């Protein structure tokens, strides 16, 4: 009798472990990178130059897809971090960059498909990236103001429509789901 109870408990724990483990795995399929150098850091400009030069390192449709995915992720995380520190102007610019790079990904996938390459795995990754970006953008929407008036010391103020930009960013990602 004790053996039957122990085996039932063991079976329950095993099933629970498998179920919980699968849920965690489903949430972690696409991982965004750790933020790199931020604007204002003395190495930021160097990283920008390396980033531009690395464009030539990634050739072919799959190479360019990877290159633009990497940059889109990088600038989304940069924007997220800057928004958290209330550096709204820099964050706004970073999110614009992320959008620009994100929109360059899909045409390269289409070109690869036209060349007869199997893009199913790359499309899956692109979809996971889109979903992860949407998740982060949704968090940003909840934690940022709708608008912000950026007032530099010796220049005209700039109105940043943060909510509108986040909505645009979401629409760009949803377009490819």
Where would I find each of the regions flagged by the language model?
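Bacterial N-terminal signal peptides that target proteins for export
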Residues: 2-11
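Bacterial N-terminal signal peptides
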Residues: 11-21
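Long, charged/polar, soluble alpha-helical segments
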Residues: 23-177
